[in-house]
């Protein structure tokens, strides 16, 4: 009886196994059993790191995470520039290059963990074909290396995530919320709005960026900051399917960072303005010379950026009008031009303040106060003002 049962079992197995073998999937191109059409073959996520205290990290960082469990691959594709830490001169000259780098996710997260910055993951709902196209596109950019000039607005971490995903989608388009499509803003305004926690970075940024960054941008072109990208993609969809698949997952726990110094650009500007007002009555020459020296140093830097630097968005800057070396060059003849020059500076302050009140950011209030202080220093050099003050005494 046992032999009969064993025989029947063997016959059953012999008939079942070929059936399984026939039904097993074999890839027609690669000849393996991995189904590359499966929706989970490749998964794509957006990784966003919290802002850091360093001036080059105050906006945070965004990159794309690509995973392929079948081949045990898990990489972050991060668009970055060459290190700025020890190359400030090259940065100001516009000589730094940018490129796409593939970094293992563990190494990427460990770097931010050491800095105390949080990292969040947002899984993307992309078509399977687009996910594989995206990986191919990213690999091609990695192979090119760091060959493109540094340009935060056109090749920053956030905007390149948008560009790569759009290229992978081909003819399919991301449908953005109407609030983004209807908003009018410049790249400079968008960036400065995210500098509230780091006032000194925002203060310096206004000196560095102008020109093209002060032109209105629309739609996805406004997504030049990681925080803006996340908010836009939360409301975006592809063919009616939400672009972000789920709530964010915390990969690295961090501590919120900000500049908590009590000495802010606004405080500095008020102190200098009060000093300029007081010096109208004190009439101390060393105050005039100190202000002239500071104005000349900043003006020379502005002239260098606009005339000689290849740094992006430095073709023109409205701060060049009050900050330039011309007053120092013609200081000996100041009695002839002091009054009209001071009037022009005050007109500049009025125009910039009006822009701010209307919501169009070109400079900050601290810059306006500094220019107002400088205009008072120059105004005091006018013979007409000197005569008026001497009569009052």
Language model: regions and residue ranges:
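Positively charged n-region of N-terminal signal peptides that target proteins for export
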Residues: 1-4, 392-393
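Sec-dependent N-terminal signal peptides
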Residues: 4-13
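N-terminal signal peptide c-region/cleavage motif recognized by signal peptidases
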Residues: 14-18
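Boundary at the C-terminal end of the N-terminal hydrophobic targeting segment
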Residues: 19-23
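Short, Gly/Pro- and small/polar-rich lid/capping loops
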Residues: 25-43
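Glycine-rich catalytic cores of cysteine/serine-nucleophile enzymes that process amide/ester linkages
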Residues: 39-116
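Second-shell loop/turn segments in exported
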Residues: 52-53, 117-125, 143-152
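Activation targets extended, charge/polar-rich intrinsically disordered C-terminal tails
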Residues: 140-393
């Amino acid at each position: 009886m046992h032999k009969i049962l064993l025989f029947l079992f063997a016959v059953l197995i012999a008939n079942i196994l070929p059936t399984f073998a026939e039904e097993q999937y074999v890839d027609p191109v690669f000849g393996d059993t991995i189904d590359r059409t499966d929706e989970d073959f490749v998964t794509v996520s957006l990784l966003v790191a919290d802002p850091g205290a360093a001036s080059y990290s105050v906006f945070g960082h965004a990159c794309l995470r690509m995973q392929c469990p079948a081949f045990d691959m898990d990489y972050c594709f991060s668009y970055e520039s060459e290190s700025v830490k020890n190359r400030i001169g090259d940065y100001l000259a516009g000589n730094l290059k940018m490129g796409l780098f593939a970094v293992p996710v563990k190494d990427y997260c460990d770097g931010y963990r050491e800095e105390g910055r949080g990292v969040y993951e947002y899984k993307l709902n992309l078509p399977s074909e687009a996910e594989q196209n995206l990986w191919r596109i990213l690999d091609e950019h990695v192979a090119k290396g760091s060959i493109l000039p540094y340009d935060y607005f056109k090749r920053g971490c956030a905007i390149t995530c948008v560009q790569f995903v759009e290229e992978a989608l081909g003819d399919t388009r991301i449908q953005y919320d109407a609030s983004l499509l209807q908003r009018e803003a410049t790249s400079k305004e968008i960036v400065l709005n995210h500098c509230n926690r780091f006032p000194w970075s925002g203060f310096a940024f206004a000196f560095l960026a102008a020109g093209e960054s002060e032109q209105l941008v629309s739609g996805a072109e406004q997504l030049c900051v990681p925080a803006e990208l996340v908010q836009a993609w939360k409301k975006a969809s592809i063919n009616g399917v939400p672009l972000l698949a789920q709530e964010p997952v915390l990969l690295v726990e961090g501590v919120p960072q900000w500049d908590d110094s009590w000495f802010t650009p606004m405080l500095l500007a008020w102190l200098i303005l009060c000093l300029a007002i007081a010096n109208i009555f004190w009439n101390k020459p060393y105050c005039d010379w100190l202000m002239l020296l500071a104005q000349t140093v900043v003006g020379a830097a502005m002239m260098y950026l606009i005339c000689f630097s290849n740094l992006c968005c430095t073709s023109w800057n409205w701060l060049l009008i009050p900050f330039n070396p011309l007053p120092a060059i013609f200081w000996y003849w100041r009695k002839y031009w002091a009054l009209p020059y001071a009037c022009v500076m005050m007109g500049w302050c009025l125009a910039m303040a009006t822009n701010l009140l209307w919501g169009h950011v070109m400079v900050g209030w601290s810059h306006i106060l500094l220019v107002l202080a400088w205009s008072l220093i120059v105004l005091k050099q006018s013979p007409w003002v000197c005569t008026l003050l001497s009569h009052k005494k």
